Swiss-Prot record:
Transfers a succinyl group from succinyl-CoA to L-homoserine, forming succinyl-L-homoserine. This is Homoserine O-succinyltransferase. The gene is metAS. Keywords: Acyltransferase, Amino-acid biosynthesis, Cytoplasm, Methionine biosynthesis, Transferase. It comes from Escherichia coli O139:H28 (strain E24377A / ETEC). It catalyses: L-homoserine + succinyl-CoA = O-succinyl-L-homoserine + CoA. HAMAP family: MetA_acyltransf.
């Protein structure tokens, strides 16, 4: 789906240089079809970088996707220009009366912060409660998975003693599931988290279906049977260099991080890493858009059916 974004958004030129199809609002207005409305709640500090990563994955299907960027943290950003936020982001009050086909909630570097200490925790709870009646399907990524499991299922925060960082092998558990359609039997995806997601925890305390897990038995991809919510505990949106940037940042901060697993050639941080997960990431987001959003959402969003009966 060509993503439909404002003409002036920096991601337009960035993604076009990568041969990614981006449709600006001015061009899209000439096509007489209803685009899918997808809201992205961007919780990452480097918002422009995160926009590029997610928009890249939303760009590869034949229908238009109308992107709306949402922020819920009113504090001044140290990593994103205020002008960019003012021009391209909306506040929750701006969209709370609207309905959306899809919602993506990104990760956030909050793995060691207790939920109640997160500055915008009440706002996250508000958005998730709102989404039950206003969004067809929501996709949670990394830290957002942990937050959603707590809010929706009451599961306490599970934290690892060491950070999981690297590119890990996964295997699918339900090859005929719509969200894993076309996946290889085993595939690679990046992780960068303190959050812990043992598959047994998901099975014991939720009715969610685990669709793929790591070789160590951690849940990677799981979803509700009605397709209203889906969870991915890794970072399939990451660029080739993202884990390297995080690693060298932590080295400079004196944190003594472990070298990301299965990432640098020959395990040497001086070597340039290569992305080995792009096809997986693209297929995951295409499947979500098609089977969890497009095939289910009503043509007229005014007639949203929250229960999907």
């Amino acid at each position: 789906m060509p993503i439909r974004v404002p003409d002036e958004l920096p991601a337009v030129n960035f993604l076009r240089e990568e041969n990614v199809f981006v449709m600006t609002t001015s061009r899209a207005s000439g096509q007489e079809i209803r685009p899918l409305k997808v809201l992205i709640l961007n919780l990452m500090p480097k918002k422009i970088e995160t926009e590029n990563q997610f928009l890249r994955l939303l760009s590869n299907s034949p229908l238009q996707v109308d992107i709306q960027l949402l922020r819920i943290d009113s504090r001044e950003s140290r990593n994103t220009p205020a002008e960019h936020l003012n021009n391209f982001y909306c506040n929750f009050e701006d969209i709370q009366e609207q309905n959306f086909d899809g919602l993506i909630v990104t990760g956030a570097p909050l793995g060691l912060v207790e939920f109640n200490d997160v500055a915008y925790w009440p706002q996250i709870k508000q958005v998730l409660e709102w989404s039950k009646d206003h969004v067809t399907s929501t996709l949670f990524v990394c830290w957002a998975v942990q937050a959603a499991l707590n809010i929706l299922y009451g599961i306490p925060k599970q934290t690892r003693t060491d950070k999981l960082s690297g590119v890990y092998e996964h295997h699918i558990l339900h090859p005929h599931a719509l969200l894993t359609r076309g996946f290889d039997d085993s595939f690679l995806a990046p992780h960068s988290r303190y959050a812990d997601f043992p598959a047994a925890l998901i099975r014991d305390y939720t009715d969610l279906e685990i669709l793929a897990e790591t070789e160590e038995g951690d849940a990677y991809l799981f979803a509700s049977k009605d397709k209203r919510i889906a969870f991915v505990t890794g970072h399939p949106e990451y660029d080739a260099q993202t884990l390297a940037q995080e690693y060298f940042r932590d080295v400079e901060a004196g944190l003594g991080p472990e070298v990301p697993y299965n990432y640098f050639p020959h395990n040497d941080p001086q070597n340039t890493p290569r992305a080995s997960w792009r096809s997986h990431g693209n297929l995951l987001f295409t499947n979500w858009l098609n089977y969890y959003v497009y095939q289910i959402t009503p043509y007229d969003l005014r007639h949203m059916n929250p229960t999907l009966d």
